[in-house]
Amino acid sequence: VEKPSPRKKGRPRRGEVRKPKTESRLERQCRQSAAEALAELPVCCDVGTKKNSQGYKESWRGYKLHADVNDCCLPISVELTAASLHDSQVAIPLMKMTSERVDYLYDLMDAAYDAKPIYEVSRTLGHVPIIDKNSRGKDVIPMAPHEAVRYRERSVAERFNSRLKEEFGARNVMVRGVKKVRLHLMFGVIALFADQVLKLIS
């Protein structure tokens, strides 16, 4: 299979006609419904390796669970994808799913979600996006003090992930196939939800 020639940089020459830039998945998700966007995402079991920001190799095998969690550590929307899929690719459909289920104001996300379409969709839904800036090798303006205080609430998402792995069986998944893996993880999510509700009312 021949690879397409790379897109030329800079201004086009006089009379030169260039193909329009290919629409990215995030740009496409802006006009799609949550169901349409999720249908495009890969859900196969895959294997891969990459270098992280510190230069160390990270490997993965299997699937990745994405969750939208409220400030009480209750999961509102959950989706399973291939492990190699970048977190930002699931942000927009999860925001749309959650907005259909509950009313909320702030979208708190880490630097992996620092992308223009995500900001745009968040504002279109009537939310306030507070997303940590991805420096991409450049200096960034720090968050305003009031945003930094609100951003601390994002720790509940990390707490949810930690509890799901350590207390509710997501660390060791001993089944194969996307349906069985999803069922295994969703039992853990339901149990965590019930446990958290009991903690809140007691």
What are these regions (language model features)?
Residues 1-124, 134:
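Polybasic low-complexity intrinsically disordered regions
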Residues 8-19, 111-177:
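Helix-centered, glycine/charged polyanion-binding patches within enzymatic domains
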Residues 90, 156, 160, 182, ...:
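Catalytic-loop motifs flanking and including active-site residues across diverse enzymes
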Residues 100, 166-169, 195, 199:
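Generic secondary-structure signature for well-ordered alpha-helical cores
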Residues 176-202:
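Charge-patterned, long linear interaction tracts outside catalytic cores
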